[in-house]
Amino acid sequence: MSTLFIGDIHLSVEYPEITKNFFRFLQTEATQAESLYILGDLFDKWIGDDDPHPFYREVAAELFALKKKGIPCYFIHGNRDFLIGQAFADESGMILLPECKVIQLYDYNICILHGDTLCTKDTEYQIFRKIAHHRFIQRLFLCLPLSFRFYIAKKLRLQSGEQNKKKGEEIMDVDPQSVLDLMACHDVDWIIHGHTHRPAIHNIEMIVTPLLSSKKIARRAVLSAWHNEGSMIKVTFDAIELIFFPFRVSDFEKI
């Protein structure tokens, strides 16, 4: 028995090999799991559920096929696909979750999220995020013609790329204190997230009883982005593992 977590797949028409390998994952590894959690940035961009491009219908069909096999797929929005709505969720069979969710899984108490909210030192991004997640702004954006939405999204991605080149590594990574605060707030022993593209499992020393100097070791598991290989976090009764798997091309000639 296992539960799988993935994120930062960044599906796009421009990167067909990533799509092919994602479909392979859904048809193989994912079918052996009890459930699948996608922790944001499933797509490289998302300008609305009403985008009629066949690419999105194909992805939705593959995800829905997993549901038909009796395997639930849960989704937390990322910074690139936070506009995914209930319409696409219904089409794909995904179950939308809030941006931060605590789950009891086997013997673990885990907080799952995309991870961008932990990068609190990146104040420019956090300001943008607050604006972009405002319901009025989102409704206004979704009222625009698709072509104009596509133009805005492309321009924002270019601007973000240029800004990120000027930011230090520390600013773009999670803030350690924000991690501690989140774990203490939800009383969890594990955090699983993506966003930073810095895969690892970190040990975190937490003070349980300040007066007695009582401490415990918590852990933070970070997913990798899907570029030249895929990654997942596999949770079983025995362990929580970060697993990488190489992309394969020859298997997908018929996909």
From Swiss-Prot:
Its EC number is 3.6.1.54. It holds the Pfam family Metallophos. Substrate binds at N79, R80, D122, S160, N164, K167, H195. It is a peripheral membrane protein. Transmembrane segments: none annotated. Pathway: Glycolipid biosynthesis; lipid IV(A) biosynthesis; lipid IV(A) from (3R)-3-hydroxytetradecanoyl-[acyl-carrier-protein] and UDP-N-acetyl-alpha-D-glucosamine: step 4/6. The keyword Thylakoid does not apply. One of its GO terms (cellular component) is extrinsic component of plasma membrane. It catalyses: UDP-2-N,3-O-bis[(3R)-3-hydroxytetradecanoyl]-alpha-D-glucosamine + H2O = 2-N,3-O-bis[(3R)-3-hydroxytetradecanoyl]-alpha-D-glucosaminyl 1-phosphate + UMP + 2 H(+). It is an enzyme of class 3 (hydrolase). Its cofactor is Mn(2+). The keyword Lipoprotein does not apply. Mn(2+) 1 binds at D8, H10, D41, H197. Its main location: membrane. Keywords: Cell inner membrane, Cell membrane, Hydrolase, Lipid A biosynthesis, Lipid biosynthesis, Lipid metabolism, Manganese, Membrane, Metal-binding. Belongs to the LpxH family. NCBIfam families: lipid_A_lpxH, PRK05340.1. This is UDP-2,3-diacylglucosamine hydrolase. The lineage of its organism: Bacteria, Pseudomonadati, Pseudomonadota, Gammaproteobacteria, Enterobacterales. The gene is lpxH.
